[in-house]
Amino acid sequence: MNLIKLIKNKLQLKSFDEKVSDFLDKAFLKENNDNLIHNNGNLVREDSKLCVFEHNFATGIYLRRMILARGAYVVGCIHKRDHVWFLLDGYVTVATQNGKQDYVAPYVGFAKAGTRRIVYAHEKTIFQNVFQNPFEYRNLDKLEEYNFSLTKKDYDDFIRSRDIKSS
């Protein structure tokens, strides 16, 4: 195999996580604008033209709602625990390490721990996540730490520490 084919094959072997990480590294170098909103590697909580967030609580549950503008992309964090999500209104394409799929509201989805999603809103969309909140947190920092990892490394560290504690 010649060198060009070898390099080309290696480039194509980048994992979903590596591609997302590369994209985010480049995005964090840019200033927020009408088309790009980020929080320098932390979860975005502030409303913008692209996305509005609502946080609600019920006993043992944290509800995180995103109202996405048509054409908005969201790169989610890695979820530490299984959870349920609802597409209440709209039409989205969701990409994960398993590929991409289109969803039209109404839809109920189940996400496994370790999943990171990239969501594209083809039209105005209401996307509702339902997370565990066994400690009844109301502090978003604590809820995010409990439910999300911002990087693959953080998620892998979480899994290792959980496995050590359960041994």
Indicate residue ranges for each PLM-predicted region.
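Surface-exposed loop/turn positions
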Residues: A72, Y107, T115, E123-T125
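Glycine- and acidic-residue-biased ligand/ion/polar-headgroup-sensing regions
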Residues: H79-N98
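A short, N-terminal "cap"/entry segment at the start of jelly-roll beta-barrel domains
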Residues: M1-G60, Q97, E145, D156-S167
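Double-stranded beta-helix
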Residues: Y120-S167
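Short acidic-glycine-tyrosine-enriched beta hairpin
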Residues: T96-R117
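Conserved short histidine dyad/triad with adjacent acidic residue
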Residues: Y62-K80
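Structural motif
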Residues: V84, Y91, R116, K124-I126
